[in-house]
Amino acid sequence: MNRRLRLLAVAAFLAAWPAAARPAPLAPRRYELDLAVDFKEERIAGSARITLENTGASALSEASFLLYRLLTVTAVRGSDGAPLAFSHNVVAFEDDPKRQANQVRVLLTPPLEPGASAVVEIAYGGYLAGYVETGALYIQDRVDEAFTILREDADAYPTVRAPSFESIRAAPPPEFDYVARINVPESHVVANGGELVERTVRDGRATYVYRNLRPAWRMDFAIARFRTLEAPGLRVFALPQDTAGAERVLRAAGACMALFRGWFGPLQDAPAFTIIEIPDGWGSQADVTSILQAAAAFRDPGQMHELYHEISHLWNVPARDASFCRWNEGLAAFLEALAAEKLDGTPTLDAQAEKVARRLRERAAEDPRLRTVPMIDYGKAGMTGDSYRTGMLMFYALYRLAGPEAFNAIVGGYYREHQARGGTTADFVRRSETIGGPGVAPLFQDWLFTTHWLDILASGAKVRELANRYRP
């Protein structure tokens, strides 16, 4: 059988794989991303060279990647440049039929042995149109000269996973290095939380080369006519109409980071930190060295608490739980309110906790699962959005029960002990119970491991008195 027929036969085999194939234990260890952005045609094109490691116990003969449904794969090659057999088909997520992606299935030849690594280079191009129709309202990603963002939320680059939210939640978060070359018109700036290695200009186009500062779990590249502001250890990319607000954001970020350092200790191996402005409604979020911050914080001083929320995530550790319930979002929601009270000088923490309690009671009427699914299982149940509120009240009660000094020792000590290798919910609970006193165990029993918290709220208990339930 000649080479062409052999490749066709293998491709036919790949096309016959079941759509619900589960992800193999493949971990991305390095990305080399090379993309050009064409505003006139509203498309991107380029390649992603991905180093994969088999973290499992048996050899693997295939890999599954996801791309946005309007991105087309033109070639797949190995480390030596030889073509690899592949198929790519637009498929629906098995647990969310509204969500569609281009699943790229690649045959690994020879099979990848346990502990071994291989390189897969995927050439692709096409369009982005977001995922708003799926209910993910913040994923409005598209190629537009006013603002463009390339991120994993919209599958703008190949991610190593299968089309199943259950399997994605169950997998540990990736950790990888990256080098990215993003080519844009000279008038535009590419913003990223990594180190800018170089910027070169040729024929009216600029190529920005970034590399990560710390092991990354995602890559975000925002493109606009940004203005850049810098201070020691901080960098802000602001949309051109918000330059004045960027000065305020820079000052507030510095004050907030100083506050958290005083509470939890310094960030370990702290690199320069980057804040990137994005339009409202596009989803503020943080990674290990940067924040995507919605424009509201740049335009309205009253919305600066959103920035405090994202900055608090810098003191998170990599979660090692399977199907993590994301209680760290509840911690961030609490620290957001606490920092706003301390930095703004107005006593708003108790009022914010009361507001969250009212909304939780409303949510329980809307979603009966809250009556039966404890927060520890929110990840398995696809309910992590509820961790923001349930977790906020849990940490509010813990803070009032243990007191500020013990609370800071819990959070800061957990960060210092587990930042390098990650930690689990069980690790955090053990530390909290050791430092926080005898009332912490029943508090976690009510708020984390059972749904008794709902009975407490339904009884009309005052939120300001929650901690009293757990005092000796």
Q: Predicted segments — roles?
A:
Residues M1-A9:
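Bacterial N-terminal signal peptides that target proteins for export
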Residues R6, A19-A45, T74, P172, ...:
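N-terminal, polar/Ser/Thr-rich
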Residues L8-A16:
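Bacterial N-terminal signal peptides
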Residues T51-L71, E166-P185, A426:
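Surface-exposed beta-strand/loop patches in extracellular or lumenal glycoproteins
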Residues L70-Q140:
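A surface-exposed beta-strand-loop module
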Residues V104, V119-D220, A224:
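Extended, low-hydrophobicity, Ser/Thr/Pro/Gly-biased non-transmembrane segments
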Residues A180, V209, F226-W327, L335:
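Juxtacatalytic substrate-recognition/specificity segment
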Residues C325, E329-A397, L401, H418-Q419, ...:
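Acidic/His/Gly-enriched intrinsically disordered linker/tail segments
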